[in-house]
Amino acid sequence: IDFPSLKKRLDDCDHNSCAEQIKLLKAAVITIADGLKERYRNGCDVDTVVYGRAKLTDQLIDIIYSYQFKDLDQVIALIAVGGYGRGELHPKSDIDLMILLQEEENQNTKDLLEKFLMLLWDIGLEIGHSVRTIEECVDESTRDITVATNIMEARLLVGDEKLFAQMKEKTSPEHI
């Protein structure tokens, strides 16, 4: 898939036309899935498909993020967690995302996040998500080993690198 071309076509879209955005992005999701299926049928090994799916999804989410969050007025980081955080994305797997906030979201951020998640669902991506501040990550990690493990395997997709680094530091095994 030609991601620079997709980004340009998305930027050229009428920002008020959800149908046009959904059509473009849904076609990209189908192209990615069909391409990976075809590679597998032609003898490509499973690991290449699983890691390739994650990398292609990373690129797609990055484009959607840059498109959807142009008017963002808060510091956030979009983070892959779970198997997706490890860079593994099996067919039909959920795409587990954590949206890390520097502070509680304001109404603008809340609206943008809602639009972002709705768009991901509308284009056929199965999204599992959480929205947390660093303090909430620390609290949840202390209470729930699955959250701690997810955060240990987390990787930054897009957004504020310093915020991500602070979260990783405060939720490291030495601090939990």
What do the predicted segments below correspond to?
Residues G35, G43, G52, G82-G87, ...:
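Residue-identity detector for glycine
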Residues N16, N42, N106-N108, N150:
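Detector for Asparagine
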Residues D47, G82, G87-S93, I145, ...:
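Flexible, active-site-adjacent loop/turn segments at secondary-structure boundaries
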Residues T171-I176:
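Short, intrinsically disordered, charge-balanced linker/junction segments flanking boundaries
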